Design a protein with these regions (language model features):
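Pocket-flanking alpha-helical
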Residues: 81-112, 135
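Exported/periplasmic ABC-transporter solute-binding proteins
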Residues: 3-4, 20-53, 58-62, 81, ...
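Sec-dependent bacterial lipoprotein signal peptides
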Residues: 1-18
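Conserved beta-strand core positions
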Residues: 45, 71-73, 124
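Short, high-confidence coil segments that cap the C-terminus of an alpha-helix
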Residues: 70, 92-93, 193
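Short helix-capping segments at alpha-helix termini
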Residues: 66-71, 169-171
């Protein structure tokens, strides 16, 4: 019964407080309402980049957005061939970075990109599951009977794999061919495959999740990575700032630390 007697009193008190406030919003509420109507980063910069650039471009994003607080950098990391296909299908892209020149050339020939710049190079290596239980020693007979995964021939890492094996006179018998180098390393690190051929940068990015086996003669096949503004972009000023960061001393240092070779070297 005590609680029943308190309810009218509490209700009256609440009405009194409401009357005193006059229904006016508090300063905090007003500020919150205004803030919700203004995007924190009103400019979106869409960067389409080869899958092998995932870690390094993600690191560069922090520096770029700190220097350009009005910009939200959004990435699409995938196989270079897929990126160019999406661009041709009308995707909203401001900057394109591919893992080889021939794929970028397709976009250039279609008039989809402006002048391109080579910013890094990359080479291949073998990775195995931790401890290398299959006993892989290189592109040799140690791969016989091993579950080997490589990139599909239509994507840059796959083209480079074919170029290298042709030069070395090696024939591979992979159990699968993937559309992105990150898929190759994912199958090895998860134990779905015994070994895979990936870029040196991808092997480093996996850390202790894989073991690395050097490929003798890997330097005979090198991929050059070009970057370019997309011709239809309406944010070329910010796109150029992104490219400038990639080419800067700091940007090149981050890429080199990840295993890439700066184009100037």
């Amino acid at each position: 019964m005590r609680s029943l007697r308190l309810l009218p009193v509490l209700g009256a008190a609440a009405l009194a407080l409401a009357a005193c406030s006059g229904g006016a919003p508090t300063p905090e509420a007003t500020a919150s309402s205004d803030d919700s109507q203004v995007p924190a980063r009103p400019v979106v910069l869409n960067v389409y980049a080869a899958a092998s650039l995932t870690e390094t471009f993600g690191e560069l994003e922090t520096d770029f957005e700190a220097a350009n607080p009005e910009v939200d950098v959004r990435f699409n990391f995938a196989g270079s061939q897929d990126l160019v296909t999406q661009l041709g299908e009308g995707a909203d892209v401001d900057v394109l970075a591919t893992a080889n020149e021939s794929t970028m050339k397709k976009a250039a020939d279609a008039g989809q990109v402006d002048e391109q710049t080579i910013f890094v190079t990359n080479t291949l290596t073998l990775i195995t599951t931790p401890g290398n239980p299959a006993g892989v020693t290189g592109l040799d007979s140690s791969l016989d009977g091993v579950k080997l995964v490589i990139c599909a021939p239509e994507v840059p890492c796959g083209k480079l794999t074919k170029t290298l094996t042709d030069k070395l006179g090696v024939t591979l018998n992979p159990v699968s061919e993937e559309q992105a180098v990150t898929d190759v390393r994912g199958k090895v690190s998860s134990g779905q495959a015994d070994a895979g051929i990936v870029y040196k940068t991808d092997a480093l990015a996996e850390g202790d999740a894989v073991d690395t086996v050097e490929i003798q003669g890997a330097d005979e096949a090198v991929n050059k990575y070009p970057i370019a503004l997309v011709s239809a972009s309406t944010k070329k000023d910010y796109g150029q700032k992104w490219i400038d960061l990639v080419l800067s001393t700091g940007g090149q240092a981050i890429l080199e630390e990840a295993g890439f070779t700066p184009a100037a070297k």
